[in-house]
Amino acid sequence: MATANSIIVLDDDDEDEAAAQPGPSHPLPNAASPGAEAPSSSEPHGARGSSSSGGKKCYKLENEKLFEEFLELCKMQTADHPEVVPFLYNRQQRAHSLFLASAEFCNILSRVLSRARSRPAKLYVYINELCTVLKAHSAKKKLNLAPAATTSNEPSGNNPPTHLSLDPTNAENTASQSPRTRGSRRQIQRLEQLLALYVAEIRRLQEKELDLSELDDPDSAYLQEARLKRKLIRLFGRLCELKDCSSLTGRVIEQRIPYRGTRYPEVNRRIERLINKPGPDTFPDYGDVLRAVEKAAARHSLGLPRQQLQLMAQDAFRDVGIRLQERRHLDLIYNFGCHLTDDYRPGVDPALSDPVLARRLRENRSLAMSRLDEVISKYAMLQDKSEEGERKKRRARLQGTSSHSADTPEASLDSGEGPSGMASQGCPSASRAETDDEDDEESDEEEEEEEEEEEEEATDSEEEEDLEQMQEGQEDDEEEDEEEEAAAGKDGDKSPMSSLQISNEKNLEPGKQISRSSGEQQNKGRIVSPSLLSEEPLAPSSIDAESNGEQPEELTLEEESPVSQLFELEIEALPLDTPSSVETDISSSRKQSEEPFTTVLENGAGMVSSTSFNGGVSPHNWGDSGPPCKKSRKEKKQTGSGPLGNSYVERQRSVHEKNGKKICTLPSPPSPLASLAPVADSSTRVDSPSHGLVTSSLCIPSPARLSQTPHSQPPRPGTCKTSVATQCDPEEIIVLSDSD
C-alpha cells in the first residue's frame, strides 16, 4: 500500500490490467469497512487466475481512503459552508469507476491532501481543482446505470450473473481499444515516414538555384517548397494528435504574451485572451481591443465612462501592438534561412581563403550596383518628364481660366451671377477656379478703392478752387452790396423788409468796427463748415427792389438747440454751375456764389425770413430771445473764445462806403426762433462735390462773407421768419435723391 507522500510510478501495463478489473464502485459506508471489501475485491482476481497475481497494484481502496481523509479535512475547515462535503461526494459518485481505481486519481488525491494540510488558507482552491478533475472524468448517464444495478443486486445473492454480465462488456471495450491502439501505431509510423520524405524533398528544393525567370512559373522550386511546408505542418499536427502530445515547437511566435497593462484584472484577462487566441496569427486592430475592453467593463460592471474606456483601449492597443511586433520580429530572426545556413559562423568566410570566389563576388556586386543605378535613373527621368508635363498642363489650364474669368465678369454681373459662379462653371477644377475668381474680385476691389481715392482728391481740389474763387470775388460782392444798400436807403419803399433793414442799422453799435484787411484775413484763415453754419438770403420784397438791383440781405442763424435735433429735413442742393432763379430775376450781370452752404431745417421751427420764388414774404415778430444753446466742438474751435451759454454764430455784414475807407461789422442778436434753427451734422453731407445739404431751394450766399465774433449783442426786435415746411412754393422742384 502506497502512502500519501510516496512516489507512484505509472506503468501502462499495470494501468491497463487495473482498468480491466470490474471493480464496482461502492458507496461511502461500505468503503469504510475494508474487511468487507477484501472478499469482493479478491473475487475477480480469483476468477482471472494467473492473470491477476498478488503483486498487481490496485488503487481503488487507496483512493477511497485518501478521499475519506480529504472529506474529513474539509468538514473541519469548511464548517461555515456545510454544502461543500455533499458536493464533493456527489462528484466522486458521478466519476467513472475506471478513473476512481486509477493511479492518476491516487496521485491527484495525494497532492491535494498534502497541499491542503500545509496551506489551509487555499483549501477552496484545492477543492475546486479536485472538482474539476472529477467533472472531467465523469461517466455518462447510460453508464451510471451499471453501478446502480450492481449495488442493487449485490444483497440478493446474484453476484455471479452480475460479474458475468459485466465481464463481456469490459472484454469488448478492451478488444476495441487494442486494435485502435495498434492501428494508431501504424498510422504514426506511416506519418513519420511521410514526414521524413517531405523533409528530404524540402532540403533538395532549398539547395536548388532559383532563377528570376522561374518566378512566374507555377511549378517553380520556391512554390513547390511552400506547398510541401504546408503539407508538413498538417502532417505534424495529425501526428501530435495521434501521439496525444502538444504541437508546440518552442518558437517565439508560439509563446504566450502576458498582459498587465491596465489596473483592472478583468480587462487584462480579456485582452490577453484576445492576443493569445489559437489560430492564425492575426494582428488585432483598435476596434477589436475597444470591443474587448467594453465587454469586460459591461460583464463585470466596472462602471467606467466611455471616454476612459477609449483611452484605456488606445493605451492597450499601443502596448499590444509593440509586443506582437517584437515577437514576430524575433521569430523571423530565429527561423530565417534554411539548413544551408545551419553551419554558418560569422567569423568563417570562404571568400577569405578562395580568391576566385572573392573576385566573382566583387564582379557580381559591381554588376548589381550598375543595374540598380540604371533602373533608378530610368524611372527618375520618367518622373521628371511626367512632372514637367503636369506643370505645363497646369500652367495652360490656369492661363485659360484667367482669360475666361477676365472675359466673363461683365456678362456674369448682367445676368445676376458673380464672376466666381461663371468661372466655376467654365473650369473643370472648382478649387482653382474659385482661387482665380477671388484674385479677380480682390483686384476689382483695389481698382474701385483707387478710383474712390482719386474722386476724393478731385473733390478736395475742386472745393479748394471754389473757396479761392469765392474769396477773390469777395471784393466785388462787397462793392455791389454797398451800391444796393445805398439805393435801398434812398428808396422810399415802406415794405417790412426795408423797415427791418433800417431798424437793424439803427441798433448797430458804432464801436464794433474792424479793418478790411483784417476781415479778409479772418475769412481766408477760417474754414467754415457747411454743417455748422446756416444762412438764408433775404430777397427783395417788391419789383422796385429788384429793378434797383438790391442784393438780398443776410441774417444770421443761431446754433441749433438740443430740442431741434428731433427731426431733420434733408434736401439736395442744386448743382454749382446751375444759376438760381433769383439771379435771373434780379440781374444777369450779377454773379452769385459757386458753392452753396447748407443747413437742415426742422419741421415747424422758426427760421430766418425767406422770400420764395413768387415774391411773397411771411412776417412774424417775436419778443425776447430764448436761452442760449451749447456750441458744438467744431464751432468752439472756429469762434475762438467766449462763454458757452452766450456764444452764437454771427453774420458779418460789411458796409463799404463810397470812399472805401472802412468796413462795418454788424452782428445780429439771437432770436428765439433762430436759437431753434437746427445745424446740419457733418456726417449728413453728401459725398458728391456738386451737391450739398440746404434748407430750401433759395439761393444761398457765399460762405466767405460769413464771420464769427466772440462777443454777443443785446437782443433787438425780432425779424421776419418763415419755415420751409410751410412756405415752400408748390411750383418748386425739390430733388430728394443722392444719385447723379
From Swiss-Prot:
<dbReference type="GO" id="GO:0005654">
    <property type="term" value="C:nucleoplasm"/>
</dbReference>
<feature type="modified residue" description="Phosphoserine">
    <location>
        <position position="737"/>
    </location>
</feature>
<keyword id="KW-0175">Coiled coil</keyword>
<feature type="modified residue" description="Phosphoserine">
    <location>
        <position position="178"/>
    </location>
</feature>
<dbReference type="GO" id="GO:0010629">
    <property type="term" value="P:negative regulation of gene expression"/>
</dbReference>
<feature type="modified residue" description="Phosphoserine">
    <location>
        <position position="561"/>
    </location>
</feature>
<dbReference type="GO" id="GO:0010468">
    <property type="term" value="P:regulation of gene expression"/>
</dbReference>
<keyword id="KW-0805">Transcription regulation</keyword>
<dbReference type="GO" id="GO:0019901">
    <property type="term" value="F:protein kinase binding"/>
</dbReference>
<dbReference type="InterPro" id="IPR038298">
    <property type="entry name" value="Daxx_N_sf"/>
</dbReference>
<dbReference type="GO" id="GO:0030521">
    <property type="term" value="P:androgen receptor signaling pathway"/>
</dbReference>
<keyword id="KW-0832">Ubl conjugation</keyword>
<feature type="modified residue" description="Phosphoserine">
    <location>
        <position position="668"/>
    </location>
</feature>
<dbReference type="GO" id="GO:0000775">
    <property type="term" value="C:chromosome, centromeric region"/>
</dbReference>
<dbReference type="GO" id="GO:0034605">
    <property type="term" value="P:cellular response to heat"/>
</dbReference>
<dbReference type="GO" id="GO:0031072">
    <property type="term" value="F:heat shock protein binding"/>
</dbReference>
<feature type="short sequence motif" description="Nuclear localization signal">
    <location>
        <begin position="628"/>
        <end position="634"/>
    </location>
</feature>
<dbReference type="GO" id="GO:0031396">
    <property type="term" value="P:regulation of protein ubiquitination"/>
</dbReference>
<comment type="function">
    <text>Transcription corepressor known to repress transcriptional potential of several sumoylated transcription factors. Down-regulates basal and activated transcription. Its transcription repressor activity is modulated by recruiting it to subnuclear compartments like the nucleolus or PML/POD/ND10 nuclear bodies through interactions with MCSR1 and PML, respectively. Seems to regulate transcription in PML/POD/ND10 nuclear bodies together with PML and may influence TNFRSF6-dependent apoptosis thereby. Inhibits transcriptional activation of PAX3 and ETS1 through direct protein-protein interactions.</text>
</comment>
<dbReference type="GO" id="GO:0016605">
    <property type="term" value="C:PML body"/>
</dbReference>
<dbReference type="GO" id="GO:0006334">
    <property type="term" value="P:nucleosome assembly"/>
</dbReference>
<feature type="cross-link" description="Glycyl lysine isopeptide (Lys-Gly) (interchain with G-Cter in SUMO1)">
    <location>
        <position position="631"/>
    </location>
</feature>
<dbReference type="GO" id="GO:0140416">
    <property type="term" value="F:transcription regulator inhibitor activity"/>
</dbReference>
<keyword id="KW-0156">Chromatin regulator</keyword>
<feature type="region of interest" description="Interaction with SPOP">
    <location>
        <begin position="626"/>
        <end position="740"/>
    </location>
</feature>
<protein>
    <recommendedName>
        <fullName>Death domain-associated protein 6</fullName>
    </recommendedName>
</protein>
<keyword id="KW-0804">Transcription</keyword>
<keyword id="KW-0137">Centromere</keyword>
<feature type="modified residue" description="Phosphoserine">
    <location>
        <position position="498"/>
    </location>
</feature>
<feature type="short sequence motif" description="Nuclear localization signal">
    <location>
        <begin position="391"/>
        <end position="395"/>
    </location>
</feature>
<dbReference type="GO" id="GO:0061629">
    <property type="term" value="F:RNA polymerase II-specific DNA-binding transcription factor binding"/>
</dbReference>
<dbReference type="InterPro" id="IPR046426">
    <property type="entry name" value="DAXX_histone-bd_sf"/>
</dbReference>
<feature type="compositionally biased region" description="Polar residues">
    <location>
        <begin position="514"/>
        <end position="524"/>
    </location>
</feature>
<feature type="coiled-coil region">
    <location>
        <begin position="430"/>
        <end position="489"/>
    </location>
</feature>
<feature type="modified residue" description="Phosphoserine">
    <location>
        <position position="739"/>
    </location>
</feature>
<dbReference type="GO" id="GO:0036480">
    <property type="term" value="P:neuron intrinsic apoptotic signaling pathway in response to oxidative stress"/>
</dbReference>
<feature type="region of interest" description="(Microbial infection) Interaction with Puumala hantavirus nucleoprotein">
    <location>
        <begin position="627"/>
        <end position="634"/>
    </location>
</feature>
<dbReference type="GO" id="GO:0006338">
    <property type="term" value="P:chromatin remodeling"/>
</dbReference>
<dbReference type="GO" id="GO:0071280">
    <property type="term" value="P:cellular response to copper ion"/>
</dbReference>
<feature type="region of interest" description="Necessary for interaction with USP7 and ATRX">
    <location>
        <begin position="1"/>
        <end position="160"/>
    </location>
</feature>
<feature type="region of interest" description="Interaction with MAP3K5">
    <location>
        <begin position="501"/>
        <end position="625"/>
    </location>
</feature>
<dbReference type="GO" id="GO:0003714">
    <property type="term" value="F:transcription corepressor activity"/>
</dbReference>
